[in-house]
Amino acid sequence: MQPTHTLTRLTVIGKLIIASSFFLSLAVQAQQCGQTAPLINERLSYMKDVAGYKAENHLPIEDRIQEEKVINSAMAQAESLGLNGESIKPLMVAQINAAKAIQYRYRADWLSQPEPGWQPKPLDDVRANIGELSTKILEQIAEELKTCKPAEMGDKAHFINTIRQHNLTSADVEAIFSTFNQVKLK
């Protein structure tokens, strides 16, 4: 009789392990959903350094050539990740517009309230970090579109509460959110 009890216990233990694995995979998947906003927030966190570098070197905030390069690169990367490249363009434009708005607002603030002793990071380093984050953002969006429910990745309250930067308005974040929801797979 003992072998039957042992077999029953093993069966129960096996079922518990399978159930645990299933719920663990759901928990991991849920953690991966809705993670685009923190990456966008981190990307925008570099704008003070960009503004400072440009102010220090008497460079304009508008850099159409750089903007075009960023947009074209993002569209090509998006396509390689299984995203519709055209659908990513409005999101990139919204992020660039928000980035420029942050830079303009910093420059305006510094006219009346300079920050003595603060030094921006070198622009080449900052752009490299921004480029890495842009890639991570696209990878995350592709992953979320493939594995997450729309409500998990497009939770407006979570998105808006996550993207918080000095000199970033709620209208800037709303524009990013609305274009984020337009991104599609191929």
Swiss-Prot record:
Q: Which UniProt keywords apply?
A: Disulfide bond, Isomerase, Periplasm, Signal
Q: What InterPro entries does the record point to? A: Chorismate_II_sf, Chorismate_mutase-related, Chorismate_mutase_periplasmic, CM_dom_sf, CM_II_prokaryot
| GO molecular function annotation | chorismate mutase activity
Primary location class: periplasm
Q: Which residues form the signal peptide?
A: 1-30
Q: GO annotations under biological process?
A: chorismate metabolic process; salicylic acid biosynthetic process
- Enzyme Commission number: 5.4.99.5
Quote the catalytic activity from the record: chorismate = prephenate
Pfam families assigned: CM_2
Q: Which residues bind substrate?
A: 43, 54, 63, 99-103, 127
Q: Where found in the cell?
A: Periplasm
Q: What class of enzyme is it?
A: isomerase
Q: For this UniProt entry, what's an example GO CC term?
A: periplasmic space
Report the domain of life of the source organism.
Bacteria
Pathway(s) annotated for this protein in UniProt: Metabolic intermediate biosynthesis; prephenate biosynthesis; prephenate from chorismate: step 1/1
Residues in domain Chorismate mutase? 31-107
Summarize subunit and interaction data from the UniProt record for this chain: Homodimer.
Its function, per the record, reads: Catalyzes the Claisen rearrangement of chorismate to prephenate. May play some role in the pathogenicity.
This protein is called what? Secreted chorismate mutase
User: From what organism does this protein derive?
Assistant: Yersinia pestis
Q: What is the lineage of its organism?
A: Bacteria, Pseudomonadati, Pseudomonadota, Gammaproteobacteria, Enterobacterales
